Design a protein with these regions (language model features):
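Gram-negative outer-membrane beta-barrel transporters
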Residues: 439, 551-556, 574-652
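Outer membrane beta-barrel strand-and-loop segments of large Gram-negative receptors
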Residues: 382-386, 425, 429-433, 522, ...
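Transmembrane beta-barrel wall of Gram-negative outer-membrane proteins
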Residues: 247-278, 289-325, 329-357, 391-398
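Periplasmic N-terminal accessory/gating domains of Gram-negative outer-membrane beta-barrel systems
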Residues: 80, 87-90, 109, 113-175, ...
Length: 756
């Protein structure tokens, strides 16, 4: 059935392609100095009133062009315009590699028109695009810009703490968010010191964050997608950087193995990066006022090799190794992740279709030794293979593909009642998808369909999706999305835990799962499922001020959780819950040549039902506000000032009713309960998560000075203050020791980065 479905997709899209008899221009726009792609450049065909914008990889296509002679004009702010004469014949598909030279000042209206064209022609519901420039502009801990810190200023995104915090997106837990790096699934993208991720900012090309309502090309998760794409190495010269701050040191090296030559688009290039934490070695000298120190240690290595053969064809080989460790007095936690793979892009001649493929594998292992609990360990490893096609017509765009996923999970855990839970499972999934984009006057529609087959469970899940946008006026647009989603991966995070360094992974259970509150009525399937509803408006108030308003509702129709209260071995290891998340996200962006301001506000509710009661999970935050501003000072903009303020209402927690002595009887009936001390057990309130922690607020400031010594040699010195007001934000309350544990206090820092 799966192969018949995919064959139908190919035949359908091939038929659409054969109907197109006019000419097509496609190509890539690059920076002439580094040969790096230029995203969102404006490409116009003078004489035909046709045009396009480049995507994140610098690619563009203009279809259904009448035959004749034209001038192709390419422009981008800060670059000289390029004008190319073009002659087109019937059925011709012409490829152009276009190189822009820095130094010109394209009109700001050109950039604005490029933005508006993209906004009017792309649905972009609940999609936020993040660039390295935006990440670097944010005041960051230690002066080290990182996507982990930038994600938290996006509407609908919440991080639960500076240390070991988890990322929650519009009511979805971390395991419901799929994090991708060049097509690879990254199971733990954030280090235990929550300021930093495994992704190197200088290596990022583009990050797409889908907070809900994503279309059919993404599957396997029920809440959100974070898609990180890295760039290729410099194709013309050897370059790099070194950086040092109180938190970490890092380096990057890149260059050509086969240099790009004039008149050719063929090259082989590489890029490699590494970073290592040093905060655990210097915290005693620099931050000795922090209770318990900052005992975090991590190391990240990533490398990429790119072969480009001309006409837009390329092959990437990549690999990574990430490690992390925490050494608290009562808790030792560590994890390691490694993987690699390849991806390719083919642009067949005289065809309106792009072929993309990816094959990756990855492995993740974690372990925790906690004085208050038994040791726990978890591992997940697997592979992913995908073949995707993009076919272009005049007002049509088809995306379709086939994917194969396989992974193994291993988890070992002993609950507080002494019952051991141990699971090792192998899982395989096949997915096929189709997304069709059609522009009809002011209306843009994107219906999609995904077929997800879970082989290990023998379950097929049909996932229709729909996105649309209606251009009410040039400055006002309505957009909406709807879709069904499923996944087979679940985690062991307990909703009672505000802080949990350890996250175990499991696949969907083979055993039967009962409906909430029932011991006889079984669920229809063993998948986690959800339905998304999103609607909102985009408003261009002025040329430089854009407002986005979105309301959303996520219906988590089935959530599978670990049964932590299991009493007997014959009881089920898993339970079913249901849930919902709903709210409104508002964001405004004001951009000038020297100044940028960003405001994001989220109002949200998250609820879960376990068969007995409806309760808010620990990441239910009612109000969340972020204010970000940057300003460039000086005749040559050599100074960059930044500020970020975050306010969030308190998270819920379950109140404590009392304590008791817990005897595990680990020696059986002969256990001595008279002279041996039992463990201290906690009696929780029957009403789950009815308490609320105090509100959170933090102000971060930064000042950066740029020094340029030559064309390629420059240095950035950044002074930053994290939690500048030294506010005592609560992290969690230690019930056993009856003491408050705060998040990190004021942390001033100075960092230096040298680029060559």
């Amino acid at each position: 059935m799966m192969m018949r479905f995919f064959t139908l997709l190919v035949l359908l899209c091939s038929t659409v392609q054969l109907q197109a008899q006019k000419a097509t221009i496609r190509g890539n726009v690059f920076d002439k100095e580094s040969a790096q792609p230029i995203a969102y450049a404006t490409v116009q065909l003078d004489g035909a009133a046709l045009g396009a914008s480049t995507d994140a990889s610098g690619f563009f296509t203009i279809n259904s062009i009448p035959l004749g002679d034209y001038t192709l004009k390419v422009s981008y702010l800060g670059y000289d315009n390029v004008m190319l004469p073009i002659s087109l014949r019937d059925g011709e598909v012409e490829y152009q590699a276009i190189y822009l030279e820095q130094g010109g000042e394209a009109l700001e209206e050109v950039v604005i028109s490029g933005y508006k064209e993209k906004a009017q022609n792309d649905v972009q519901v609940s999609k936020l695009t993040v660039t390295p420039k935006q990440i670097r502009a944010l005041p960051s801990a230690g002066g080290d810009a990182d996507i982990a810190q930038y994600l938290t200023v996006l509407p609908g995104v919440i991080l639960t703490g500076d240390q070991g915090g988890q990322l929650y997106i519009r009511g979805g837990s971390p395991v419901q968010n799929r994090i991708l790096l060049d097509g690879m699934t990254i199971y733990n993208p954030f280090h235990s010191l929550g300021f930093f991720s495994v992704f190197e900012t200088e290596l990022i090309r583009n990050v797409d964050v889908f907070t809900g309502g994503f279309n059919a090309e993404y599957g396997g998760r029920t809440s959100a997608i974070v898609d990180v794409q890295t760039r290729e190495g410099n194709r013309k010269r050897v370059a790099g950087l070194v950086s040092a701050s109180p938190f970490q040191i890092k380096g990057l090296i890149e260059g050509p193995l086969v240099k790009l030559k004039e008149g050719s688009d063929k090259s082989i290039s590489f890029v490699a990066t590494a970073k290592k934490a040093i905060i655990n070695q210097v915290d005693d000298q620099l931050y000795n006022y922090v209770d318990g120190g900052i005992p975090f240690n991590y190391q990240d290595i990533y490398g990429k090799l790119t072969l480009q053969s001309g006409n837009g064809n390329k092959l990437n080989l990549f690999g990574f190794n990430y490690t992390d460790g925490v050494d608290f007095p009562a808790t030792q936690f560590s994890w390691g992740s490694s993987g690699g793979g390849l991806d390719f892009q083919l642009l067949p001649q005289n065809s309106n279709t792009i072929v993309k493929g990816v094959f990756t594998f990855s492995d993740y292992d974690s372990e925790i030794n906690d004085a208050d609990n038994k040791p726990r360990s978890s591992g997940i490893n697997g592979y992913f293979a995908g073949l995707n096609f993009i076919s272009f017509g005049k007002d049509n765009e088809f995306r379709y593909g086939l994917e194969l996923t396989g992974f193994q999970t291993a988890f070992e855990f002993e609950n507080f009642r002494g019952v051991n839970i141990n699971q090792t499972e192998n899982t395989s999934e096949i997915g096929a998808f189709l997304r069709w984009k059609r522009k009809i006057g002011p209306l843009v529609i994107e219906p999609g369909f995904r077929l997800q087959y879970y082989l290990s469970l023998s379950d097929v899940y049909y996932e229709p999706r729909l996105g649309l946008k209606y251009n009410i006026t040039d400055n006002l647009r309505f957009k909406a999305a709807w879709g069904l989603y499923s996944q087979n991966l679940l985690s062991t995070i307990n909703d009672r835990d505000v802080v949990n360094l350890f996250v175990g992974f499991l696949s969907g259970p083979d055993e039967s799962i009962f409906e909430p509150g029932s011991t006889t009525e079984k669920t229809e399937n063993r998948l986690q499922t959800a339905i998304h509803y999103v609607g909102g408006f985009e408003i261009d108030l002025f040329k430089t001020l854009n407002l986005n308003i979105e309301g959303y509702y996520k219906d988590f129709t089935q959530l599978i959780s670990l049964n932590r209260d299991k009493l007997e071995p014959e009881e089920s290891d898993f339970i079913k819950e249901t849930g919902e998340a709903y709210g409104v996200d508002v964001s405004a962006k004001y951009e000038l040549r020297r100044a940028n301001f960003w405001v994001a506000y989220s109002l949200g509710w998250v609820k879960r039902f376990d068969g007995e009661q409806t309760y808010p999970p620990v990441f239910d935050r009612r109000h969340n506000l972020n204010l970000v501003g940057t300003y460039e000072v000086g005749a040559k903009r050599q100074w960059e000032l930044g500020a970020r303020f975050n306010f969030g209402t308190g998270f819920p927690f379950t109140l404590t009713q009392g304590f008791y002595t817990n005897y595990t009887f680990d020696q059986g009936i002969g256990s001595d309960v008279l002279t041996n001390n039992g463990d201290l057990g906690i009696v929780y309130s029957d009403d789950r998560n009815t308490g609320r922690l105090p509100a959170y607020s933090r102000l971060d400031l930064s000042a950066k000075r740029h020094f340029r010594f030559s064309k390629h040699l420059r240095m950035d010195v950044t002074a930053a203050v994290t939690n500048a007001l030294d506010r005592e934000n609560i992290f969690y309350f230690d019930r056993v020791r009856y003491e408050r544990v705060n998040q990190l206090p004021i942390l001033p820092s100075l960092s230096v980065q040298l680029q060559f």
